């Protein structure tokens, strides 16, 4: 086999591979000899079929198998011998001329094919002990713990029917019918809908108009849908809701005590506080870790400047751009609405894609040099987490990861990256800084790994790399009329 390099331009490589016809024929003859005693051909005893006859009958099919195997297996071996790693699967090209292909299958012509690929650049790792980061720490107060417990208690609060009129904090059970321009709209009708006044679960202006109503009252409520409402046919529109109040119920008093803890399935209020404190600390810890990662990635970005494989950059850009356009379509906005242009956005996100690819290669090299691996147990836990997100679709998800090439990499990559980050955090210079909750959760655009501008569409793209720690509370339950459908479609951070 002869390998000739025909292109070496930057990271791009092209190779011409030539396997002499004689070598191909020799391999074919070996295979035919292996099956000689197994084939059954009328007129010949087992094992007595002449080699020429066997070749005439099966030669081309065996040669076709050889060609497929060579194209499948040789590229990786060739790159390994050259000490190169391909950024993506090498592109293989063979002759498309039928006459020439027939000659190859008949061992009358050399088998030639070309490989086109981009190499992963060699990365010389640098010491990281010069990286300095600030770890923001929030001290969770007793008041914050109690405040969170009260929210939990309120979600489990009981209500008792009352005879008087509805007030703030009361639960109103009602039937309603929503209309725009006097015409009912889809999702605007419900019966026995429950709404706690002051919960802000329905669109602005709705709940306040329930105050003062009692069971049996009927009223027409006038509201205006927010301009950013997800349903484009309702956004910014004036609407009316025909309301029939069926019950008004007052909330029971809520106290933070052992009785509340028992109601929530715990043995004491101290245990309840311990659990809630741990949850809050975990939430803050996640935000802190994201900020630490951003600081490390920003400094690694300054340390490593090299050409990134264009095919990887193209693929990353396509993913980002697809998400950006999806976000714009869902919000009903344009690039102009976001105070930018499509060309400017493309340039910005192209730079972001290049940054991501470069940093991904650096992290991969760090992990490889440190012999960091992802265990089968870790992969199983990641798969289980995926299954929990899609109840009822477990078989389809398992089949997808089992049968889709590269799908398991989507499970492995985040685990690998977090383990590499653990290593880096243990080696860089870390200074702890006590901050307030507000300071920790304040949006830090300049430090965001995605470098988003102050545009909502761009902020959404940022979430692919840097999940926000403070999730937005979902809008109402199934009461579609006055809720924001964004709770179903929105961000899961």
UniProtKB/Swiss-Prot annotation:
InterPro entries per the UniProt record, alphabetical: PPIase_dom_sf, PPIase_FKBP_dom, Trig_fac, Trigger_fac_C, Trigger_fac_C_sf, Trigger_fac_ribosome-bd_bac, Trigger_fac_ribosome-bd_sf, Trigger_fact/SurA_dom_sf
Calcium keyword on record: no
Lineage: superkingdom: Bacteria
Subcellular location(s) of the protein: Cytoplasm
Main location: cytoplasm
Keywords: Cell cycle, Cell division, Chaperone, Cytoplasm, Isomerase, Rotamase
Full protein name: Trigger factor
Underlying gene: tig
